[in-house]
């Protein structure tokens, strides 16, 4: 008996051990990412030819303790290598495992290489050459917990490479993963009709057809690791190949199972047909170009097994949630009596199906950990009602009905109001229903969802499910393209700057506000370039600016400065510490045709600039951050702690008869009115003038003050 190790992805071990037992192996022992077994040479060949789950078969030559570099060298040197491969063959070493004296795998590989070369020389043979990329003979070594296993790659190139695939789609599924899905779903045992509505390059269906027709998975392969192994018995191997060809011929004539595959991409369907033809099963599979939501269930019952698109693969998350929600409808309405198995790396997408899983398994797709869920559709169901059209007093569906109804109500009211107001961007929803803790802003025909951090006592699974329901409900509630929904996470942080960059991608739009135009960037930063809650404050700045010199401190993208300039200001000075936002402010001025020397842009620390400037102004707008500890600031800034000192400096810049509009977003802000009045200021809260209709549900979003000279 010979010893072997069948390597496979983690999670395959149990199914692989059953397959090996069925093929006739003995002394089967599961390990991490594989299974040890014993078999005579003929059976070792047979397993290599017929295993659908293994990644590779390793012929084990030596296994024993290894506690030092010397022990590793001696273990490799003790093998009679000239009986394994010719010195005219090239070789390579794949070393796996770390720990103890093995600090990196290259060290282990070099030790074994030295031992092999020395053994050949000591036995009076010239040394074989190392070929790292495409060696004739690949030695495989595993080091784990003080034990070394040395063997050679009996099967050669990875066994999932069956030999029938011409090229792959954008997100190919490995053949042994497809086989594992067929085994673990129960289809291999059931042997019934099979449908894959996201067939891609056809892997699941081709693997299934090969199973049903008794076609060996290795029958189309041209290379094996034992080709350059000196004890290789070509006669036995050829007999096994002939037997496999005969079984395939008989199996194809007896197969009565029907296979159905479809994909929306005609290029992929053509590729699937070529792959199926190469595998010899094209005549068994009915391939069609079709949207998965339009697929008709074949008569009777069967299995639907698929790997639909998910987050890492081909799609925007919001549109994918919509797809999965509609798939759930499709399955319930049209696939009564069917068994369904779905592979996905995103459990939130699976939850959007709104189906209860009979079984949930983990299954890796390459390095990506996935869920493999099995469902049974027990009876035909009518299609669910669109959540946006459900009345709260009616039947409550499994989707967020109150949220959908609130969104629809808000949209109807605010869309009409926005058109009258002369704006095209507004806040649609702001945690109106506490369970759905998001803010939703509409920018033209795009929507930005900001997810607030949930309280720690709420389970993460609950918050994820609620967010999923929000993303599913929103497109139909307001008639927006799911691809136009952008999701961000906003935490109420302390000790960090609010202007952190989020992503490299940009999505720029031009929005209009009371005749002013502003550039938006919906993706790159947490904020978009325009604080919608300050809309009326900016309008007020514009109304007060005619014939006056204006200064905008902590200007962000200069939107208040634009309103001041359009309002007739004699000069506008825009100050911000960020070069990015100063440049953005200049773009906003250019958008509005405002090009003049009377518009000044200053990149500076506002707190320091106020102390050193000699300029004086008639109107100053100051909207500092709640907190900042930017690298460009020597000290941190806290608006509650520092507003008195800051406003004292601002007041010194004010001309007689001038006004300061001071605003901030600290929810529990307390103005030091008495102290300011003692310094000769008149202070008036003007929140009621600056809170727009779309923020009436959140009256503490900001607080605004008008400051003038007393008397």
Curated annotation (Swiss-Prot):
Gene Ontology cellular component terms for the protein in this record: cytoplasm
Keywords (A to Z) from UniProt: Cytoplasm, Methyltransferase, RNA-binding, rRNA processing, S-adenosyl-L-methionine, Transferase
Domain of life: Bacteria
Enzyme Commission no: 2.1.1.173, 2.1.1.264
Database matches in Pfam families: Methyltrans_SAM, RlmL_1st, THUMP, UPF0020
InterPro entries linked: 23SrRNA_methyltr_KL (IPR017244), RlmKL-like_Mtase (IPR000241), RlmKL-like_Mtase_CS (IPR053943), RlmL_1st (IPR054170), SAM-dep_methyl-trfase (IPR019614), SAM-dependent_MTases_sf (IPR029063), THUMP_dom (IPR004114)
Catalytic reactions on record: guanosine(2445) in 23S rRNA + S-adenosyl-L-methionine = N(2)-methylguanosine(2445) in 23S rRNA + S-adenosyl-L-homocysteine + H(+); guanosine(2069) in 23S rRNA + S-adenosyl-L-methionine = N(2)-methylguanosine(2069) in 23S rRNA + S-adenosyl-L-homocysteine + H(+)
Stored CDD domains: AdoMet_MTases, THUMP_AdoMetMT
Location relative to the cell: Cytoplasm
Keyword Protein biosynthesis belongs to the record: no
Main location: cytoplasm
Single GO MF annotation: rRNA (guanine-N7-)-methyltransferase activity
Residue span, THUMP domain: 43-154
Homology family: Belongs to the methyltransferase superfamily. RlmKL family.
Role, per record: Specifically methylates the guanine in position 2445 (m2G2445) and the guanine in position 2069 (m7G2069) of 23S rRNA.
The protein's name: Ribosomal RNA large subunit methyltransferase K/L
Organism: Shewanella halifaxensis (strain HAW-EB4)
Name of the encoding gene: rlmL
């Amino acid at each position: 008996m010979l010893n072997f190790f069948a390597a496979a992805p983690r999670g395959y071990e149990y199914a692989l051990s059953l397959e090996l037992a069925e093929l006739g192996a003995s002394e089967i022992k599961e390990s991490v990412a594989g299974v040890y077994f014993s078999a005579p040479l003929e059976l070792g060949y047979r397993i290599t030819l017929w295993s659908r789950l293994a990644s590779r078969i390793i012929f084990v030559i030596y296994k024993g303790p290894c506690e030092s570099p010397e022990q590793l060298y001696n273990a490799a040197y003790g093998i009679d290598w000239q009986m394994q491969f010719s010195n005219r063959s090239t070789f390579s070493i794949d070393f796996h495992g770390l720990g103890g004296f093995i600090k990196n795998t290259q060290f282990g590989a070099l030790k074994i290489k030295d031992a092999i070369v020395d053994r050949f020389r000591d036995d009076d043979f010239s040394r074989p050459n190392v070929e790292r990329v495409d060696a004739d003979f690949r030695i495989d070594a595993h080091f784990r917990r003080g034990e070394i296993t040395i063997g050679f790659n009996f099967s050669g190139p990875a066994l999932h490479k069956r030999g029938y695939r011409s090229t792959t789609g954008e997100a190919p599924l490995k053949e042994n993963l497809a086989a594992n899905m067929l085994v673990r779903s129960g289809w291999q045992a059931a042997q019934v009709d099979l449908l894959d509505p996201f067939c891609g390059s056809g892997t699941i269906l081709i693997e299934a057809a090969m199973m049903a027709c008794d076609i060996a998975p290795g029958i189309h392969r041209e290379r094996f690791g034992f080709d350059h192994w000196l004890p290789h018995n070509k006669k036995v191997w050829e007999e096994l190949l002939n037997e496999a060809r005969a079984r395939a011929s008989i199996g194809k004539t007896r197969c009565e199972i029907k296979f159905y595959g479809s994909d929306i991409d005609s290029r992929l369907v053509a590729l699937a047909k070529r792959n199926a033809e190469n595998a010899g099963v094209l005549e068994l599979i009915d391939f069609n170009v079709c949207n998965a939501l339009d697929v008709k269930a074949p008569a009777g019952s069967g299995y639907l097994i698929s790997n639909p698109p998910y987050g890492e693969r081909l799609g925007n998350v919001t549109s994918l949630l919509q797809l999965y929600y509609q798939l759930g409808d499709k399955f319930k309405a049209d696939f009564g009596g069917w068994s369904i198995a779905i592979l996905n790396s995103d459990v939130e997408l699976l939850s959007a199906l709104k189906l209860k899983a009979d079984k949930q398994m983990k299954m890796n797709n390459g390095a990506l950990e996935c869920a493999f869920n099995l469902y049974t559709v027990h009876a035909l169901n009518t299609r669910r009602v669109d959540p946006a059209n459900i009345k709260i007093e009616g039947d409550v569906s499994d989707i967020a009905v109150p949220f959908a109804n609130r969104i629809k109500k808000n949209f109807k009211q605010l869309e009409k109001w926005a058109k009258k107001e002369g704006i095209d961007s507004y806040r649609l929803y702001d945690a109106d229903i506490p369970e759905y803790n998001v803010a939703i802003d509409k920018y033209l025909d795009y929507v930005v969802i900001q997810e607030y951090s949930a309280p720690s006592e709420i389970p993460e699974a609950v918050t994820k499910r609620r967010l999923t329901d929000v993303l599913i409900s929103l497109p139909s509630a307001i008639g927006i393209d799911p691809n136009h929904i952008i999701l961000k996470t906003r935490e109420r942080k302390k000790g960090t700057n609010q202007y952190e960059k989020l992503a490299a991608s940009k999505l720029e739009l031009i929005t209009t506000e009371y005749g002013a135009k502003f550039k938006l960037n919906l993706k790159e930063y947490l904020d978009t370039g325009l604080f919608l809650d300050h809309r009326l404050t900016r309008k007020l700045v514009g109304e007060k600016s005619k014939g006056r010199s204006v200064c905008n401190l902590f200007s962000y993208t200069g939107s208040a400065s634009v309103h001041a300039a359009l309002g007739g200001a004699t000069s506008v000075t825009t100050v911000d510490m960020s070069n990015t936002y100063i440049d953005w402010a200049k773009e906003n001025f250019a958008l509005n045709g405002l090009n003049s020397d009377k518009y000044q842009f200053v990149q500076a620390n506002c707190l320091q600039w106020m102390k050193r400037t000699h300029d004086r102004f008639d109107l100053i707008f100051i909207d500092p951050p709640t907190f900042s500890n930017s690298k460009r600031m020597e000290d941190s800034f806290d608006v509650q702690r520092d507003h008195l000192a800051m406003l004292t400096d601002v007041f010194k810049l004010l001309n007689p008869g001038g006004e300061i509009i001071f605003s901030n977003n600290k929810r529990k802000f307390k103005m030091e009115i008495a102290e300011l009045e003692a310094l000769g200021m008149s202070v008036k809260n003007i929140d009621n003038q600056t809170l727009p209709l779309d923020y009436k549900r959140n009256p503490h979003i900001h607080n605004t003050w008008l400051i003038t000279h007393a008397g």
